[in-house]
Amino acid sequence: MALVKVKPTSPGRRGMVKVVNADLYKGRPFAGLLEKKSKTAGRNNNGHITTRHIGGGHKQHYRVIDFKRTKDGIPAKVERIEYDPNRTANIALVLYADGERQYIIATKGMAVGDQLMNGSEAPIKSGNCLPIRNIPVGTIMHCVEMLPGKGAQMARTAGAGVVLMAREGVYAQVRLRSGEVRRVHIECRATVGEVGNAEHSLRKIGKAGAMRWRGVRPTVRGVVMNPVDHPHGGGEGKTAAGRHPVSPWGQQTKGKKTRRNKRTTSMIVSRRGKK
């Protein structure tokens, strides 16, 4: 995997940096693990915009990822590493000894032909999935469950990883990349190692059109809109917003806390540090 700086043959390619991985499979994805993915353009079932700056983009299939890894004791072999347009991490197609194929998140250093195992008897090896009670303290993990059997929810993006800090009774403490320390039940599963494709954060898109391919529409400032479109709009010539920054619907947009107290923080040991 390498970063390639593109030659400035046009204004759109000037400054563009691509991530090139010669090991990625160049054929079509495995058809048995594809599902239809419908585009919403950021609208809900009423047709109202619920998420701005979404629309268009290339057609995609959803790759069904096995986030639970519950096929215990059955060895699996990595058949190929693939690109997934739905996430920043690459994915691996694994073939289990019983003939079943599954997609999993590709781990850093994973290669075609690697042998993997799930379950409490699996060795501590990058790519193997075990309950946290069987993983040594200090191990870097990814694809960590928050509730036993629910499937991986934490550390799934490219280059992500959490550190197992300690075990106390039925709970373990893990430190996230943000610095937050959380409690997780020791029966929750996690995969050993870091997520691959860490260079993804170093790429440079280069042009607006490349973001349109990804389904991202332009972001327009409120101060250049008309008063009917945004609270910051209107005025003769260039004018300031005239009030504290708000969203198009009048909600404070800088610094206002929006967290609902209904969602418990009992599993958070220490919050992430200020950046």
UniProtKB/Swiss-Prot annotation:
State the residue spans of region: Disordered. Answer: 224-275
An example of a Gene Ontology cellular component annotation for this protein is:
large ribosomal subunit
SMART domains tied to this protein = Ribosomal_L2, Ribosomal_L2_C
Q: Name one GO molecular function term.
A: transferase activity
- Entry coiled-coil feature ranges: none
Q: How does it assemble?
A: Part of the 50S ribosomal subunit. Forms a bridge to the 30S subunit in the 70S ribosome.
Protein name according to UniProt: Large ribosomal subunit protein uL2
**Species this protein is from:** Herminiimonas arsenicoxydans
Q: Which gene encodes it?
A: rplB
